[in-house]
Design a protein with these regions (language model features):
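DEDD superfamily 3′-5′ metal-dependent exonuclease/proofreading module
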Residues: 1-75
């Protein structure tokens, strides 16, 4: 399975639209918040797909996939 580049790019562009971390770029969400979603259920929309993807990336130690994208965005 190959990573979807568009999905990865959205992880460094889109802000969390609600909740405790509203306004934070998705890739900067803490693992504990993603674990909470994993237990309670991810949203059933595009945001849910992004959060679930980010959860898998962080749980598998693959954050380095996002580093070049973050640098291109100036973070």
């Amino acid at each position: 399975m190959q990573a979807n580049p568009q999905l990865l790019l959205q992880l460094v562009e889109i802000q969390m639209p609600y909740g405790r971390f509203k306004g934070r770029i998705l890739c900067d969400l803490p693992v504990s918040y993603l674990e909470w979603f994993s237990r309670k259920g991810f949203p059933k929309d595009k945001l849910g797909i992004l959060l679930q993807t980010l959860y898998e990336i962080k749980m598998n130690g693959l954050e380095n996939l996002l580093e070049p994208l973050k640098k291109n965005k100036g973070y």
